[in-house]
């Protein structure tokens, strides 16, 4: 499954839960997650999401660009941000119970 299909599923599920998804363009930062998911109610939180094509999250990070992404994700986690890497509908369903 392509990353774009997983992205469409993420957006649909978040909207179904009453939340919002934003595609984020980072200026001067390489490797940052490309989606911000905001949920309300019992899920009242925000989570940064990096999407991958199906099967690639288990290999993350395996390219120089992904190693840079991994370092940036770790920097964000160090200051209390929740960052996840998802590559399947099941991963999205687990994130959005």
For the regions a protein language model found, what residue spans apply to each?
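Catalytic phosphate/metal-binding cores of nucleic-acid and nucleotide-processing enzymes, i.e., regions
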Residues: 1-97
